[in-house]
């Protein structure tokens, strides 16, 4: 799994001008699933995301987790994280899981995450418009292959 984690003050996702998910202070996650990902990768990612101390405490130090601040997550499926740009000018996405597995794992990931924090989602496979106000900005790349 590759997950882009962005700390935000607010974010929303729309499909055809209808808002389908929105959050206030929290995290936007762009989630990519690889063919070789397992449920252990999901557990690892959920543990890291919910425990990562990337929110400021009263002294301005990044010392609080998403759970500590009672923040929310906006989770967006993002197969393009596996773009291969080595040849030519059009990216190939053969490194992404097939849609059936990716959808299944994306759902499991969101369900596991929801056991710890409030989760809003986009719609798997849809053309979405994501709006967000970055906080910091703080942007972190989590790759479960680099445990």
Curated annotation (Swiss-Prot):
Molecular function (Gene Ontology), one example: Ser(Gly)-tRNA(Ala) hydrolase activity
Superkingdom per UniProt: Bacteria
Enzyme class, first EC level, given as a word: hydrolase
Keyword Mitochondrion: no
Transmembrane portions of the chain: none
EC number: 3.1.1.96
Predominant place of localization: cytoplasm
Motif (Gly-cisPro motif, important for rejection of L-amino acids): 136-137
GO cellular component: cytoplasm
GO biological process assignments: D-amino acid catabolic process
Catalyzed reactions per annotation: glycyl-tRNA(Ala) + H2O = tRNA(Ala) + glycine + H(+); a D-aminoacyl-tRNA + H2O = a tRNA + a D-alpha-amino acid + H(+)
Subcellular location(s) per record: Cytoplasm
Keywords: Cytoplasm, Hydrolase, RNA-binding, tRNA-binding
Family designation: Belongs to the DTD family.
Main function: An aminoacyl-tRNA editing enzyme that deacylates mischarged D-aminoacyl-tRNAs. Also deacylates mischarged glycyl-tRNA(Ala), protecting cells against glycine mischarging by AlaRS. Acts via tRNA-based rather than protein-based catalysis; rejects L-amino acids rather than detecting D-amino acids in the active site. By recycling D-aminoacyl-tRNA to D-amino acids and free tRNA molecules, this enzyme counteracts the toxicity associated with the formation of D-aminoacyl-tRNA entities in vivo and helps enforce protein L-homochirality.
Record note on quaternary structure: Homodimer.
Domain characteristics, as noted in the entry: A Gly-cisPro motif from one monomer fits into the active site of the other monomer to allow specific chiral rejection of L-amino acids.
Protein's name in the database: D-aminoacyl-tRNA deacylase
Native species: Streptococcus agalactiae serotype V (strain ATCC BAA-611 / 2603 V/R)
Biological classification of the source: Bacteria, Bacillati, Bacillota, Bacilli, Lactobacillales
